[in-house]
Curated annotation (Swiss-Prot):
Record Pfam families: PapZ_C, RapZ-like_N
Molecular functions (GO terms): ATP binding; GTP binding
Its job: Displays ATPase and GTPase activities.
Binding locations of GTP: D58, A59, R60, N61
InterPro entries: P-loop_NTPase, RapZ-like, RapZ-like_N, RapZ_C
UniProt protein name: Nucleotide-binding protein Noc_2797
Keywords assigned by UniProt, alphabetized: ATP-binding, GTP-binding, Nucleotide-binding
């Protein structure tokens, strides 16, 4: 049996993630007390109909129970239940904006909101440290998050590690959820060609421009060589998720092109390869 544990700071999209999995026929429970996790896991093992489940855990648990999470997780794993932990987060500025827009009450509402966000992140630290997959929802809409959850988690019947290539722009910040970050700002920039400026790295004119430069080809080959060497080692350690972020200045041309090229190359080698362009969304 596989059990997904969805956690994260308030406002990061935990409920959306659970609803996305529920739509994929997962059995979902939100805000289950941590001390009930072993009981729930044993019950699910006895019910052959429920082989995929997702549990939402957040700061509404008592602090002492949150601190016991690593021990409880070990108990569940010893019982033969394979757990995947997904932790959602976002920048403080984004979380403050979301609470302002929705006017919802924070679980730690007895203190100022900015302080509550920091305290909650600290309370959930024991869960975040155990996360198999961290998702930064700072620049992600509701619909994009639902799609991302469905693609990375909802299709776990397919074997192998889920590999995501993500392009981004440094001027908008580095993704918080990346395992590898590669800076390609040293490559020729199509932005300085007026006819290419409004296009993206997926357009044929930009692709042709970048393919003409030997430095771009060399960077692409170096990334492939590096990743081919190390991806199998990550997979051999039973790693379920890996995110490779490629960054250029604006996240529109060079990083998009290379993310697409890497996806095309590794798609033939791995069953679960995805590509996301943060700044084009």
């Amino acid at each position: 049996m596989k059990l997904h544990i969805i956690s994260g700071v308030s406002g990061s999209g935990k409920s959306i993630a659970l609803h996305a999995l529920e739509d994929r026929d997962y059995y979902c429970i939100d805000n289950l007390p941590i001390y009930l996790l072993p009981t729930f896991a044993k019950r699910m093992q006895r019910d052959a109909r429920q082989l995929r489940a997702a549990i939402g855990i957040d700061a509404r648990n008592l602090p002492q129970e949150l601190r016991q999470f690593p021990q409880i997780l070990e108990e569940i794993e010893r019982a033969g239940v394979h757990c995947h932990i997904i932790f959602l987060d976002a920048s403080d500025t984004t979380l403050l904006k979301r609470f302002s827009e929705t006017r919802r009450k924070h679980p730690l509402s007895h203190i100022p909101l900015a302080e509550a966000i920091h305290c909650e992140r600290a309370l959930l630290g024991t869960i975040a440290e155990k996360a198999d997959l961290r998702i930064d929802t700072t620049c992600t809409t509701i619909h994009q998050l639902r799609d991302l959850i469905s693609e990375r988690i909802g299709d776990d019947a397919r074997p192998g590690m889920s590999l995501l290539f993500q392009s981004f722009g440094y001027k908008h910040g580095v993704p918080l959820d990346a395992d590898f970050v590669f800076d390609v700002r040293c490559l020729p920039n199509p932005h300085w060609e007026p006819h290419l400026r409004p296009l993206s790295g997926r357009d044929s004119e930009v692709i042709a421009y970048l393919k003409r430069h030997e430095t771009v080809t060399q960077m692409q080959q170096d990334l492939i060589t590096f990743l081919q060497h190390w991806l199998q080692r990550f997979q051999n350690t039973n790693r379920s998720y890996l995110t490779v972020a490629i960054g250029c200045t604006g996240g529109q041309h060079r990083s998009v092109y290379l993310a697409e090229q890497l996806k095309a190359h590794f798609h033939s080698l791995h069953a679960r390869v995805l590509c996301r362009h943060r700044e084009l969304s």
